[in-house]
Amino acid sequence: MACGLGYLQGATLAQQTMIIQNMASGLTGMICDGGNHGCAMKGIVATDAAFRAVDLALKNVCISGIHGINGKNAEDTMRHMGLIASPGMVQTEKTIVEIMEQK
């Protein structure tokens, strides 16, 4: 969504990369805790983050690759996000399910 917003606002390829870097920096780590009202809130947060990531990138502001999980380019960053999702979140998912089962 964020890159689509950037495209509609005339973002260059370099700015599209910045959008990806900004989104990864802002949202990576958000966890799914089951289908519930929290999902709607997470959708709102992600939408807000998309608009902010685009606004920053269009001003050539970007969280660089030396910070957090960001890589030297968008592809590296997305690869890092994939590693966090699997295998990185396997135990987290099990823990969330255990918490939900105990309710």
Regions found by a protein language model. Name each.
Residues 3-103:
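Functionally critical mobile loop/hinge segments
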